[in-house]
Amino acid sequence: DADSVMSGDILVQMTAIMEANPRVGILQSAPKAIGRHSLYGRIQQFATYVYGPIFAAGLSFWQLGDAQYWGHNAIIRIKPFMENCALPVLPGDPPFGGEILSHDFVEAALMRRAGYEVWLSYDLDGSFEETPPTLLEELSRDRRWCQGNLQHLRLFLLKGIIPAHRFLFLNGVMIYGSGLLWFCFIFMSSLQALLDVWIEPVYFPTEYALFPEWPVWYPGWAIFLFIVTTVLLFLPKLLGLYLVIAKKRADLFGGAGKLVLSVLLETLFSVLFAPIKMMFHSKFLLLALLGQKVGWGPQERSDVGLSWKDALRFHWRDTVIGLFWGAILWIVNPAFCIWLSPILISFVLSIFLSVWTSRPTAGELFKRLGLFLTPQEMDPSPEMKILAEVLANPPLPAYPDFKLAFFDPWVNALHRSLLCKRGRLMPEVLKKALNAIDSKEALSKSEIMALLHSPAMLFELHKCLWESPKEQFVEKWSRYLSWI
């Protein structure tokens, strides 16, 4: 991917594994997060280094040769991939139809169906990637993944898919379905807490009853649910922390004390972020089921921070819900309101949390305090040093976007050769594009995408431009050069 880095050593090791095991079709590495300066990004980076190794080892233990492909930082055996992993266009409309958005899980399942294994090289170092710099950027990516994972339900009964990958398809859906289930659970629990106060228990529902019917409460079940939930959430973090200390690697995280404090703070932030993600995931799932389409556009990779305006636009509903929900519970059932306070506080603070954790200044503050440090910051590898030098160079000049494919013969020919479909010739769009050379705003996004996905229209547009009278073409070409 554009945000991926792999060392030469891990490429050589993975290639050797592929050569020694001809039945391995895909070998996936376990990338560590790098390059983030925002507080949110630094928290995610820290988590991948502390919890990532034990998580990846656990995945490899259970999946063995039925692992997942994550779409990047992997080595693929090309011939079986080309022969067996072509993605179908699903019939019908999104979310269950159309082009498959989350392609990697499907390609791994198709590779296994063809008899080749998919493995996770969890114990090899030297694989890196950038994570989203802000909470909203991560949620934007999650929305695309949500629709893509829903499409996997169409492939669940596909002939030849092994049970392990059928389960992974369901698990991918439950990543977002669990958020909706959690919301329903706390909503129904809140409703029950209100009814317990508003409705007096009836001890004798029938006349002339000899014995009363007492309200039943099962504290053992509640305690058991609380313990199981706590273990599932926090035991992996404790095991990851123990593993770092046991291997005497705490110095690479700023020392044992700073490491433990960072884990505690990461846990606190996770508790605050989880309800916000729950609300967004619930909305994503419902919107996808209602047929709202999403695309796969470019991702924001820079640590520029989030504006208060954008945060307010996306989080105001969470804040209002948190205030309204909390006020009702506090008035009617204060004890339950206190019990639910971690979730309600997260809703109320969602705007502030999203903005503050997106700021590089907040990330640098924690870095100066020695918190959320990672081994690549304490002892950077040669690849990270080279990457830092390259990123320190002035950026390349920006080029005009889609118009480059209109004018430039080389770009036009290359772009058309890379398109796998012929595309439809739409005269009205082509005519509008010819008039849009002078005004980029004249073309809508859908029209631009139609042009860029149609080799026939790109050829006709390019041909018309180059066959136009010399004076007109020179004028247009001069204007084009001024854009560079």
Language-model-derived ranges and their functions:
Residues 64, 131-135, 141-337:
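Basic/Trp-rich segment in TM-proximal cytosolic loops or flexible interdomain/linker regions
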Residues 27-29, 43, 76, 111, ...:
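Generic structural hydrophobic/aromatic packing signal, biased to beta-strands
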Residues 1-160:
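Internal catalytic domains of large membrane-associated glycosyltransferases
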Residues 300, 308-484:
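C-terminal amphipathic alpha-helical interaction region
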Residues 86-90, 119-124, 219, 301-302, ...:
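Short acidic (Asp/Glu) and glycine-rich catalytic loops that position anionic groups and cofactors
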